Amino acid sequence: MKMSRRAYAEMFGPTVGDRVRLADTELFIEVEQDLTTYGEEVKFGGGKVIRDGMGQSQLLADEVADTVITNALIVDWWGIVKADVGLKNGRIWKIGKAGNPDIQPDITIPLGAATEVIAGEGQILTAGGIDTHIHWICPQQVETALMSGVTTMVGGGTGPAAGTSATTVTPGPWHIGTMLQAIDDLPMNIGLLGKGNLSLPDPIREQIKAGVVGLKLHEDWGSTPAAIDNCLSVADEFDVQVAIHTDTLNESGFLEETLAAFKNRTIHTYHTEGAGGGHAPDILKAIGQANVLPSSTNPTRPYTINTIDEHLDMLMVCHHLDPAIAEDVAFAESRIRRETIAAEDILQDLGAIAMMSSDSQAMGRVGEVIIRTWQTAHKMKVQRGALQGDETSHDNSRVKRYIAKYTINPAITHGLSHEIGSVEEGKLADLVLWKPAFFGVKPSMIIKGGMIAAAPMGDINASIPTPQPVHYRPMFGAYPRGVHNTCITFLSQAAIDDGVAEKLKLKKLISPCKNTRQITKADMKHNTYCPVMDVHPETYEVRADGELLTCEPADVLPMAQRYFLF
């Protein structure tokens, strides 16, 4: 029996050679491989395959998947592949072909009475997003981020304090302990950052031992060369990452002094971008350093006709500045430069900036990391054409580059990639399903550690799940006992060895960060470009390897108003 491509795609989803448009963008992906078997596909429902004696075997629970996602199109840094995905004990068990091995050939994911089915036909499956620039200003950020497809948040803070509103820091053992307890019921993998702005090591050591997963150097606390050097030395001692927001005012040194203080040690440079902060106007030059792992934040993503006007007011609020003080206004204006914002678009597209993040409620939008990433990719496709390596028929290389920016690369940077960051066997089953028309905008399901944690849901009193009003709601995996079995609190190895989780009576899964100190830009997936950078001190023109980087602001974007009428 033969089926037309259209009929096959409508029944089982796209297969090799089929192309899929991502939302209303100009980005198209093409299926590279299909791990299912034609004629042996499994699908659940009335008159379908996954029934007793057919696609469902008689095997016991230990031998079968707890959950199978059938016929999903995986989009990840390593490929764009159609497959069944088996989950077991909260982890990605196997990626391959699901079914009944007693009667079907080449089965790698046995199904049985213990198996739940999630229908992935016609849907895209991605890893949960990772946002590594979180200001813990309010706990409600978690729900907003989760509903957008983010499943891991790394940052610092204690609530709407002035220090937290400006800097991603949870300072000192008492705050670290109380915050670790406070986040224990939140449906999100979380790691806290401590304060790294110190010239002596012991106050940093005690924070690492108290449970932070990394350290933050921020100019508002004084990002001096001495503090940078000391912080990186302690980070090397304990194998934790350091994130830095450099000195916008160039008070304690210029960019060259900051880079010298790094001493070729690995560091995650926040705001390596056009307007977010750091050495003005040339923080973008840090991109050319192999030891620098650069990220930018979503308020400038992508460059549009409204970007400049929006930023001045945001900056005054976030950094506790007074519009009546001329020096404060000058500080704000020094950080917002249309030339460097435009260059940021292109540097993201070239793979020179390796990561995307939010800067939640501190100029960035916590629920828009994923949207802004794909809007940037779309704008660059329209303005710059196909990436090298992409054919005219698809954008697979560009899509892999951009999805790595908020999944695997932040996981590698912060030492979390042994647990999360990709759709790979053995990792925590943090997965997001998307209908292609809503890709990057509105997920159809968020799976957290193998449990459904969030999904759009209709009227609870309706006879079926779909009647209006439909909106995102927490599911069983987002409630406390579900959270404790499916979400990770990341700690330093020193804190784990010191029994911090037991002392604080933490109930979430606990995992260490590791392998953070020897990585370089070369370890970033699809984002390894290390150009020689130049920023003109007066015109702010940006050049990478001698090429002038400039582009026009967008006056219209996809993934925007047409998706948010209600």
Swiss-Prot record:
GO terms for biological process: urea catabolic process. Its EC number is 3.5.1.5. Ni(2+) 1 binds at residues 133, 135, 216, 359. Its cofactor is Ni cation. Gene3D superfamilies: Metal-dependent hydrolases, Urease, subunit C, domain 1. Its main location: cytoplasm. Residues 128-566 form the Urease domain. Pathway: Nitrogen metabolism; urea degradation; CO(2) and NH(3) from urea (urease route): step 1/1. Carboxylation allows a single lysine to coordinate two nickel ions. Keywords: Cytoplasm, Hydrolase, Metal-binding, Nickel. Heterotrimer of UreA (gamma), UreB (beta) and UreC (alpha) subunits. Three heterotrimers associate to form the active enzyme. This is Urease subunit alpha. The lineage of its organism: Bacteria, Pseudomonadati, Pseudomonadota, Gammaproteobacteria, Moraxellales.
